[in-house]
């Protein structure tokens, strides 16, 4: 996709990352646990400081965030959130395809989980070749095999 770029997040991106997650994900969290702003901010800060985040940019504009963790046997997409006004434009598809392509070069599958109530995300990942491999009370685990 022309103009699409990932850049490593810095501590200065933490608030953007939180606000992006909130804009894209709050409605789903509310349906399961309710949205406690203080608790969500605490969880975000913990994850943001312990995972490698990237800021997704389109033509120089920050439009989303993504956190990828490479394990010995797979690559995990821990988070991917696109601001609502940029959803449906192929940005998430391009980002996920890049992760899948990069993982394929090292013969690794790609795994993730989505909230069960987020049917849109589940359908999105299925369209990109992900299969359900398990579930918990709240999440569906998915994998894009080699």
Task: Give the label of every model feature segment.
Residues 4-19:
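A short beta-loop-alpha structural element at the N-terminal edge
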């Amino acid at each position: 996709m022309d103009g699409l770029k990932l850049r490593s997040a810095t501590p200065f991106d933490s608030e953007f990352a939180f606000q992006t997650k909130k804009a894209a994900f709050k409605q789903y969290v509310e349906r399961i646990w309710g949205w406690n702003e203080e608790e969500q901010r605490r969880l975000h800060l913990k994850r943001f400081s312990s995972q490698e985040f990237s800021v997704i940019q389109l033509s120089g504009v920050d439009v989303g965030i993504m956190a990828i963790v490479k394990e010995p046997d797979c690559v995990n997409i821990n988070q991917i959130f696109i601001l609502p006004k940029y959803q449906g434009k192929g940005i998430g598809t391009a980002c996920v395809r890049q992760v899948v392509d990069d993982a394929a070069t090292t013969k690794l599958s790609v795994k993730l989980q989505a909230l069960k109530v987020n049917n849109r995300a589940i359908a999105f990942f299925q369209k990109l070749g992900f299969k359900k491999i398990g579930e918990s009370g709240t999440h569906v685990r998915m994998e894009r095999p080699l």
